[in-house]
């Protein structure tokens, strides 16, 4: 019985993560080595701080998916930080709220927004890193 519950829980958790809108459109869970490599290569980088219970994050998800599909952002490296489970990364990047978006141009922070759900301003903010 316990094994059955464990398996069911694992399947549901995996399904939730896979279906999470923030992971759509080419986003990757934050990886320090990949982030450092992208910075060293001078790539444009977007970090989205996401929580599955956050309505603002859910509103941002289709905009971020559209952004990734835009040819202007074809070289963008897109990472997601989980607000609930990656507190060390929140401290590293000075994040205090879910729905925070941070754009980097190489190793320099180019722009940051919190709680923005307007397509034009998100595109403009991330555009500062391109």
Model-derived features: positions:
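A short beta-strand-turn-helix
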Residues: 27-43
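Thiol-based oxidoreductase modules, predominantly thioredoxin-like and allied folds used
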Residues: 73-87
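Non-catalytic, surface beta->alpha helical segment in thiol-disulfide oxidoreductase systems
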Residues: 105-130
């Amino acid at each position: 019985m316990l094994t059955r519950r464990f398996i069911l829980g694992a399947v549901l958790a995996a399904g939730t993560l896979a279906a999470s809108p923030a992971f759509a459109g080419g986003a990757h869970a934050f990886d320090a080595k990949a982030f450092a490599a992208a910075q060293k290569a001078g790539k444009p980088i977007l970090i989205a701080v996401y929580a599955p219970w956050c309505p603002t994050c859910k509103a941002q998800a289709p905009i971020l998916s559209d952004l990734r599909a835009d040819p202007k952002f074809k070289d963008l490296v897109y990472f997601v930080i989980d607000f609930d489970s990656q507190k060390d990364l929140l401290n590293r990047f000075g994040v205090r709220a879910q729905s925070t978006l941070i754009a980097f141009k190489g190793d320099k922070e180019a722009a940051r927004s919190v709680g923005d759900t307007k397509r034009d301003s998100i595109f403009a903010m991330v555009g500062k890193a391109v």
